[in-house]
UniProtKB/Swiss-Prot annotation:
Its main location: nucleus. Protamines substitute for histones in the chromatin of sperm during the haploid phase of spermatogenesis. They compact sperm DNA into a highly condensed, stable and inactive complex. Residues 16-102 are annotated as: Disordered. GO terms for cellular component: nucleosome; nucleus. It comes from Hylobates lar (Lar gibbon). GO terms for molecular function: DNA binding. Testis. Belongs to the protamine P2 family. It holds the Pfam family Protamine_P2. This is Protamine-2. InterPro entries: PRM2. Residues 49-102 have a biased composition (Basic residues). The gene is PRM2. The lineage of its organism: Eukaryota, Metazoa, Chordata, Craniata, Vertebrata. Proteolytic processing into mature chains is required for histone eviction during spermatogenesis. Transition proteins (TNP1 and TNP2) are required for processing.
Length: 102
């Protein structure tokens, strides 16, 4: 998982606007980062607590698809192997049994 996250300009402007509304001084934070190279900014953000894990928000459709795949994946594998065996052998000789996961 990636430890740092580069924010877009729009997110940065919202953050600065929110700080100005709250009355926090934005000067020292902005001036320190301006004189640093991109690599140093990355290190600075990591060491000064501005880093966070990049999270991918899952949609309901994506979660549903992943959940379905977990249940059906083992059955699909067994069916595919049986189809391949039918080509070469006279029948599927594997016993029909449920997946051990369920």
């Amino acid at each position: 998982m990636v430890r740092y996250c580069v924010r877009s300009l729009s997110e940065r402007s919202h953050e600065v606007y929110g700080q100005q509304l709250r009355g926090q001084e934005q000067g020292h934070h902005g001036q320190e980062e301006q004189g640093l190279s991109p690599e140093d900014v990355e290190v600075y953000e990591r060491t000064h607590g501005h880093s966070h894990y990049r999270r991918r928000h899952c949609s309901r459709r994506r979660l549903h698809r992943i959940h379905r795949q977990q249940h059906r994946s083992c059955g699909r594998r067994r069916r595919r192997s049986c189809r391949q065996r039918r080509r070469h052998r006279r029948g599927c000789r594997t016993r029909r049994r449920r997946c051990r996961r369920h």
